[in-house]
A protein has these predicted regions:
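Generic hydrophobic transmembrane alpha-helix motif, especially the helices
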Residues: 78-115
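Hydrophobic alpha-helical segments of membrane proteins
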Residues: 48-59, 92-96, 152, 156-175
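Transmembrane-helix boundary motif in ABC transporter permease subunits
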Residues: 45-82
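Transmembrane alpha-helices and adjacent helix-loop boundaries
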Residues: 46, 70-72, 87-93, 105, ...
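Alpha-helical membrane-interface segments at transmembrane helix boundaries
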Residues: 37-45, 78-85, 165, 187-191
Length: 193
């Protein structure tokens, strides 16, 4: 009788253990499908959109800040603007754009693109100053695109891919401002505690 009592206790423990495991698997699958997967997808989409806009901003910012293309005075003014834009944190831009545009992914994309695009353009244009151009350089956009841009573009892309990691991390953190990235779900978990 003692062995049957132990067997019954073992079976009830196994059943409750299996039920516990089943509940854990159900909870984990709900968590992954309802929060983790949508958060990761939104984070990646926002980061890739910000990366693309940062690239465009860096291309335009470096072109208008080149002394050979826009003149010394305007280039210096543009460089000062790039310096200011890269100095303002993404969170400040995101907060201001969220007040102006409402809560969506657009304020975060614009904030990340402006900050990182200005940073990359500023660093790239410093490299462009060292590029020597031929005697046939005409001082127009086509001359810039033919002689200067090919010389600075590999460095620009290296900086852009380096900053992608930062953009991805900042995208997750910007979720705490209410954008539905992975940071949003992390923040709501702490609110529930």
């Amino acid at each position: 009788q003692d062995s049957s009592l132990q067997s019954h206790a073992y079976q009830s423990g196994a059943i409750s253990g299996m039920a516990l495991l089943s509940q854990f698997v159900d909870w984990l699958s709900r968590l992954l499908s309802e929060q983790a997967l949508p958060g990761v997808i939104a984070t990646l989409l926002l980061a890739l959109a910000a990366l693309g806009m940062s690239h465009l901003f860096a291309l335009i910012g470096s072109a208008v800040s080149d002394k050979r293309l826009s003149g010394r005075f305007i280039a210096n003014i543009n460089r000062l603007g790039l310096l200011v834009l890269r100095s303002v944190p993404e969170y400040i831009f995101a907060f201001v754009f969220m007040l102006l545009l409402g809560p969506s992914m657009l304020p975060a994309i614009l904030a990340l693109a402006i900050h990182n695009g200005a940073l990359i353009a500023y660093l790239t244009i410093r490299h462009a100053d060292d590029v020597t151009v031929s005697a046939h350089f005409n001082g127009r956009l086509d001359g810039y695109g033919y002689e200067v841009l090919p010389a600075i573009y590999p460095n620009m892309m290296a900086l852009l891919f380096y900053r992608f990691e930062v953009i991805l991390r900042e995208t997750a953190i910007l979720g705490m401002l209410g954008i539905a990235t992975s940071g949003f779900y992390f923040d709501s978990i702490f609110d529930a505690i």
